[in-house]
Amino acid sequence: MSIKPPSALSELVEALRALPGVGPKSAQRIAYHLMQHDREGAERLGRSLLFATEHLRHCEKCNTFTEAQVCEVCSDPERDPALLCVVETPADQIMLEQTMTYRGLYFVLMGRLSPLDGIGPKEIHFDRLVRRASDGIVKEVVLATNFTNEGEATAHYLGQTLKARGLAVTRLARGVPVGGELEYVDAGTIARAMLDRRTL
């Protein structure tokens, strides 16, 4: 007869498996480590997760994570409201900010088109983006989706729709490698891609 782990431990392993890049073995190792060697760390992690879920929300304007109704970037009067950069995730937005080359505003899709995974325009907040870009203030939309198949398809779809509304649409230059995700690219490469962006 095989011994099963306690249900509380099994639930922890399953919860960890839901994280990107964490498979069953990694989830099991993390769970056992936390319970055997780092109970204090486990409690801190639990408190931090609970605090984040209770206090983080989406910015009313750009859809990124914030603790206020409107995020710090959207509230900054020094930003250029005529320039709107579209990114897939808040992590991509942070990478672009670290380049210190972009002074416009953002819209965070919270994903990318992936019909096979059931992610269509609604799931990436397409209608909100169109409303934001069509506010009469935005003049150029910079598509900074990743250079993956889904990211390229998302950029193409967004570009066609936004150009039809009379907006100038540009795309990051190819300093970012094909298949690359902004979150993992160095700031210098992203800065060059932003400066060399091309018209679609």
Curated annotation (Swiss-Prot):
Domain of life: Bacteria
GO MF annotation terms: DNA binding; zinc ion binding
Sorted UniProt keywords: DNA damage, DNA recombination, DNA repair, Metal-binding, Zinc, Zinc-finger
Biological process annotations from GO: DNA recombination; DNA repair
Domain Toprim: 82-177
C4-type zinc-finger residues: 59-74
InterPro entries in alphabetical order: DNA_Rcmb_RecR, Rcmb_RecR, Rcmb_RecR_Znf, TOPRIM_dom, TOPRIM_RecR
UniProt record similarity statement: Belongs to the RecR family.
Function of the protein: May play a role in DNA repair. It seems to be involved in an RecBC-independent recombinational process of DNA repair. It may act with RecF and RecO.
Name of the featured protein: Recombination protein RecR
Species this protein is from: Burkholderia pseudomallei (strain K96243)
